[in-house]
Amino acid sequence: MKQYIIALGLGMVLFLGGCGSQEAIDTYSFGQKVINVGQSEVIVDSPFDFGQLDKIVANDKGQPLTIYAGLDKNYGVYVSATQASTGAPLPTLEEGTKLGQQELTKELGQAGAKAQWTQEPVQMDGVKAVKSTLDAGSNGQTIRFTQYTFINKGVLWNIRYSYSDQSPQGEEINQRVNGHIQVTKKEG
């Protein structure tokens, strides 16, 4: 009888273990992150909460740079916001797009040097933007990056999403949040 109960218990554990879902909606608590920089505000959909990496720092031109990021094994969200400073105006949208691409390519090293960016004009809540994509391969996997670049109320925004092609949850998350960016239209 004792063996029967153990076998039944083991069978139930195996059966119930197979009933679990590996869908991202069951694993992540999707939400929105509101980010304010200067007079500009964006709302970014994300699978998790993420925060500001540092207090406002400066880029190589002395312009204030605010960075927010979140990353786990399936997905990454990166937001940078650059403001103009005295003697260092913001780059144009096209220049800002190229700068964001160059920054990521440099971070990726050899894998980034071999990869090619594609880009297309898009609208983010009526604001002219550029959507850039890059697939960078390394160690038998491909990391997919999508970056949205736009300028709003004196702030150059670069919002980047990333996931591995070997992560089904990463792909599912990407379908839920990629490009879901609101540019608020508050007065003042």
Residue ranges and their predicted role:
Residues 36-37, 71-72, 136-138:
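Short acidic, glycine-rich loop/turn motifs
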Residues 55, 103-149:
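Signature of long, low-cysteine stretches enriched in small and polar/charged residues
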Residues 71-76, 127, 150-156:
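Short, solvent-exposed coil/turn segments at beta-strand boundaries
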Residues 64-71, 144-152:
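Short, surface-exposed beta-strand/loop micro-motifs that present aromatic residues
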Residues 3-66, 141, 161-188:
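N-terminal targeting sequences that direct proteins away from the cytosol to non-cytosolic compartments
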Residues 67-98:
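A short acidic-to-branched-hydrophobic micro-motif
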